[in-house]
Design a protein with these regions (language model features):
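General structural feature for long, well-ordered alpha-helical segments within catalytic domains
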Residues: 4, 15-18, 22, 35-46, ...
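Non-cysteine beta-strand/loop elements that form the S-adenosyl-L-methionine
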Residues: 78-80, 193-195, 352-357
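Metal-dependent amide/peptide-bond hydrolase catalytic core
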Residues: 218-395
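Histidine/acidic-residue-rich, glycine-tolerant segments that coordinate divalent metal ions
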Residues: 86, 92-104, 111, 117, ...
Length: 395
């Protein structure tokens, strides 16, 4: 079958019931990061049924790679979907809601996987006319920040030889079926911060005989908020949030240990470097003032997801060809949430985009919300864009 636009849409219409059925099966059978055993087996089974060569347990994980070789020589283009769910109890009320209490596809990975499988089914039908090879990446542990699943997969060398890789994320704040893409950063770098402050216990009535880590921690948390407002270049956005603090053993004992955990989100390495440096400097000041001994554990997690201007224009052009100008959402700014797809873009050419997933007029539930669910009408559109990206790169 010739790979014209009309022919592709016809195939997508034919396989849309399969796409929806696969999405519903995945949605009601969620598995957490690193535990995607049944999910991976399902992905492998479906890929094989489309005539795709499959490799399982890649890099010693649940990762699955599928290879579809076209009838003509050409580049190697990869499409990626993440497989893991979140430790949340679903409240969508869907007839195909999660069957596993405390586990839910609340970040749309069920949509990502069904789109990947849909793209595989479509491309397999036209493989004789396809130039090059398509690699389907079924990645575990995207939610397992700050390590994630992409890093190990890339480091294993299993993806060596790829010429370009493309990924998407369903996006509830965009109208269903529209595409959002930006040059430069689209999603933020995500770093994990852990601080341990050590002091000395004493009776609460004799605080001068101890070293109070709770007081020191309180001062540190206040002082740290000036890092973003006064030490980081204001042209480089940064978010510094501490979401957890633990310390003390009893109400009338001066606490000798406090642990603080938080995250830093940035788009630029300059801001990332500045936050880490000034956190360390602030802790040194607290130690000098209060007599504490503090240790900063600053773990750099996912890098920022960045599209080159060339790739952003390429994706936008494909969207216009498929959906017209109205298919491109008016996206003005990136997000401070993170995605380990950035790891692929640090090693390979490629790009990333958002797929609108909420019907107009309906309540917008954010990602990681117990009520979030992907609008199934956006799924065939995601398939069309993924397939069209492959065809445009291999033409």
């Amino acid at each position: 079958m010739m790979m014209d636009k009309r022919g592709i849409k016809k195939i997508i219409n034919e396989v849309t019931p399969d796409i929806i059925a696969m999405r519903r099966h995945i949605h009601e059978n969620p598995e957490l990061s690193g535990e995607e055993v049944n999910t991976a087996a399902f992905m492998a089974e479906k890929l094989r049924s489309f005539g795709v060569e499959v490799e399982e347990h890649v890099a010693g994980t649940t990762a699955v790679l599928g290879y579809l070789k076209g009838g003509k020589p050409g580049p190697v283009i990869a499409l990626r979907a993440d497989m893991d769910a979140l430790p949340m109890t679903e409240e969508t009320g869907l007839p195909f809601a999660s069957k596993s209490p405390g586990k839910m596809h609340a970040c749309g990975h069920d949509g990502h996987m069904s789109i990947l499988l849909g793209a595989a089914e479509v491309l397999s039908r036209i493989k004789d006319d396809l130039s090059g090879t398509v690699v389907f990446i079924c990645q575990p542990s995207e939610e397992k920040s700050p390590v994630g699943g992409a890093k190990g997969l890339i480091a294993s060398g299993a993806l060596d030889g790829i010429d370009a890789v493309y990924g998407l994320h369903v996006w509830p704040t965009l109208p269903s079926g529209t595409i959002g893409v930006l040059p430069g950063p689209m999603m933020a770098a995500s770093d994990h911060i852990r601080i341990v402050m050590k002091g000395k216990t004493s009776h609460a009535a004799m605080p001068h005989k101890g070293v109070d880590t709770i007081v020191a921690a309180a001062q540190f948390l206040t002082a740290a908020q000036t890092i973003v407002s006064r030490r980081v270049n204001p042209l480089y956005p940064a978010v510094l949030t501490f979401g957890k603090i633990t310390g003390g053993t009893r109400y009338n004992v001066v606490a000798d240990t406090v642990e603080i955990e938080g995250t830093c989100r940035t788009y630029h390495e300059e801001a990332q470097d500045a936050v880490e440096t000034y956190l360390q400097d602030t802790l040194k000041g607290m130690d000098a003032m209060y007599g504490t001994e503090s240790t900063l554990y600053y773990e750099r997690g996912y890098a920022a997801v960045r599209n080159t201007p060339v790739q952003a224009d390429f994706i936008a052009g494909v969207v216009r060809q498929c959906l017209g100008d109205e298919g491109l959402a008016d996206v003005q700014e990136p997000a401070m949430t993170a995605e380990d797809f950035s790891g692929y873009l640090q090693h390979f050419d490629g790009g990333f985009f958002w797929l609108g997933a909420t019907p107009q007029g309906q309540t917008v539930y954010p990602l990681h919300n117990t009520h979030f669910a992907v609008d199934e009408k956006c799924l065939p559109i995601g398939v069309e864009i993924m397939v069209s990206l492959v065809l445009a790169k291999t033409a």
